[in-house]
From Swiss-Prot:
<dbReference type="InterPro" id="IPR045082">
    <property type="entry name" value="ATP_syn_F0_a_bact/chloroplast"/>
</dbReference>
<comment type="function">
    <text>Key component of the proton channel; it plays a direct role in the translocation of protons across the membrane.</text>
</comment>
<dbReference type="GO" id="GO:0005886">
    <property type="term" value="C:plasma membrane"/>
</dbReference>
<keyword id="KW-1133">Transmembrane helix</keyword>
<dbReference type="InterPro" id="IPR023011">
    <property type="entry name" value="ATP_synth_F0_asu_AS"/>
</dbReference>
<protein>
    <recommendedName>
        <fullName>ATP synthase subunit a, chloroplastic</fullName>
    </recommendedName>
</protein>
<feature type="transmembrane region" description="Helical">
    <location>
        <begin position="219"/>
        <end position="239"/>
    </location>
</feature>
<dbReference type="GO" id="GO:0045259">
    <property type="term" value="C:proton-transporting ATP synthase complex"/>
</dbReference>
<dbReference type="GO" id="GO:0046933">
    <property type="term" value="F:proton-transporting ATP synthase activity, rotational mechanism"/>
</dbReference>
<dbReference type="GO" id="GO:0009535">
    <property type="term" value="C:chloroplast thylakoid membrane"/>
</dbReference>
<keyword id="KW-0793">Thylakoid</keyword>
<keyword id="KW-0813">Transport</keyword>
<feature type="transmembrane region" description="Helical">
    <location>
        <begin position="132"/>
        <end position="152"/>
    </location>
</feature>
<keyword id="KW-0472">Membrane</keyword>
<keyword id="KW-0066">ATP synthesis</keyword>
<keyword id="KW-0934">Plastid</keyword>
<comment type="subunit">
    <text>F-type ATPases have 2 components, CF(1) - the catalytic core - and CF(0) - the membrane proton channel. CF(1) has five subunits: alpha(3), beta(3), gamma(1), delta(1), epsilon(1). CF(0) has four main subunits: a, b, b' and c.</text>
</comment>
Length: 246
């Protein structure tokens, strides 16, 4: 037991303590958390909730304005879920995939468009929630839990037969594939958003007037692509777990 702790558990704790830059720490129930991430995450959640309330407070048979935009986004998310998960199962996963897509999109755009770094805090600096590895890992783990839940809910313990298909010797590869999915999801999103904000920050410091604007517009585009990729992969993983293998 002691050997297991030294070999596996302790290294995991060391990895979890790795961070990029300085952070504004809060202590909650004896645990230190990144306060700046909570602040920007609450801002993003508040923005999304406020938009939803305003856009849908007075629904009309013929949508217009914000209601029309809200319905377009909902239809887009529904089509995305239908394409990735499949016609039989997609409806129950529209809320999850939609929440993931909207949260990641608004978080990314907040980093590309808002001057977070101009707001002073006691330590560290504000940035997009997806600029922090803890946020992207949490989203990736939620996705992993969801596709395991989807597969077990539909197939029961028979879901785990997929690890020995089409041949038993593929078991290690199939297990490794499942554990690599959250890693690839989290590090792809974190790396792209961090790199984008660093590039914009450097250009603003060097040439603060015109040059950063095209880069910021490019950041808006790539941020949307990253949100779409994350939501698409989440839907694809769920669809893969519920599909019937013959």
């Amino acid at each position: 037991m002691l050997n297991l702790q030294n070999v596996i558990i302790n290294p995991l704790f060391e990895i979890s303590e790795v961070s990029v830059g300085e952070h504004y720490y809060w202590e909650i129930a004896g645990y230190e958390v990144h306060g700046q991430v909570l602040l920007t995450s609450w801002f993003v959640l508040g923005t999304v909730i406020l938009f939803g309330l305003i856009a849908n407070k007075d629904l009309k048979p013929l949508p217009e304005g914000l209601q029309n935009f809200s319905e377009l986004v909902t239809e887009f998310i529904r089509d995305l879920a239908k394409t990735q998960v499949g016609e039989e199962e997609y409806l129950k996963w529209v809320p999850f995939i939609g929440t993931i897509f909207i949260f990641v999109l608004v978080s990314n755009w907040s980093g590309a468009l808002l001057p977070w770094r101009l707001i002073e805090i006691p330590n560290g600096e504000l940035a997009a929630p997806t600029n922090d590895i803890n946020t992207t890992v949490a989203l990736a783990l939620l996705t992993s839990i969801s596709y395991f839940y989807a597969g077990i809910r539909k197939k029961g313990l028979g879901y785990f037969k997929r690890y020995v298909q089409p041949a038993v010797f593929l078991l290690p590869i199939n297990v490794l594939e499942d554990f690599s999915k959250p890693l690839s999801l989290s590090f792809r999103l974190f790396g792209n958003i961090l790199a984008d904000e660093l590039v914009v920050g450097v250009l603003v410091a060097l040439v603060p007037l015109i040059v950063p604007i095209p880069v910021m517009l490019l950041g808006v585009f790539t941020s949307a692509i990253q949100a779409l990729v994350f939501a698409t992969l989440a839907g694809a993983y769920i669809g893969e777990s519920v599909e019937d293998h013959h």
